[in-house]
Amino acid sequence: MTTRVAQTRTSAAPPAEGRPRRGLVLGGGGMLGAAWTVGALCAVEEAVGWRPGGAEVVLGTSAGAILAAMLAGGVRTDQLRDHQRGLPITAGPLAGVAFDYETAVGGALPPRPRAGIGSPGLLRDAVRHPREYPLLTMVSAMAPHGRGSLEPVGELVRGLLGPGGWPDGSPLRVAAVDYRGGHRVVFGDPGAPSAAVAEAVMASCAIPGWFAPVRVNGSAYVDGGCWSATNADLMLGRGLDEVYVLAPMALRLHPRGRAEPARGTVAALREWRARDRPRGVLAQLVGRYRRAVTRQLLRETRLLRASGVRVHLLAPTLADLAVMGPNMMDPARRGAVLESALRTSRAALDGVR
């Protein structure tokens, strides 16, 4: 498969002398993936003594793009946590900002989509050149246009970063997929289409079949997860020493990228199936998807490590998966997922500093 990205890379800005140049990757995962990621971010800050929002590059995909924008807008990890908990925020960019996590994106199920194929042109190209596209990109081309609205997400981002273009010097990068050409775009990079941050984040969150594609400068874009749930390989060539990857759709990785001790990815999935016995079509599909995401993530991180970048991975444990359930858009589980992630991520990061 050929990796295609519609822009050139840029080196990270120099950090303070003596400090490693760090990058942060926040993967997609819907409502519950965002809640898990907030818990993991808090654990990273506590364990490493490093403020994730201070990374030289913060790359977000889908729900991770929302959190990346919030961090780039100056929101602290403890404020993200308290906001998820429904506690009042009295200082900083989130002070007084209302966001209804229960209803913002329409609830646990999508509205009935429109009839028809979402991107006939992309589907035609993918059939002609299947090696050039991930399977999920090909599938997304067939999905009909969704009727869900991402405007509440856009309003949240505009409230934090304003309605204009990309802030000068911002570390924020947002991954999305061009819905006609099928290639990845990293908004915020030199050579990428110009976009307001809110537009870019909404584009990165536009799950085919759930939300309508988001138009930026006349072109339609969909969820960056249609290429990769993390897009961690996009951190190559940015002059970074180490990268933290938080991947809520992967399978229970430890900080250095292993599956849980002495177990490979396949063995971990078998144990998960034996213990939790996922039933129903959705549960089985999510299990298969997690396995595929984990394998792709490990391929991406091998590329980073081969280039000399230290990579630290975090993903849900068995305990997290049991709390999440199969529907990553179920708002009723959000609070429990956050608290579980705080516990399990702290344990996974014990002794990392």
What are these regions (language model features)?
Residues M1-T61, A69-R353:
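Patatin-like phospholipase
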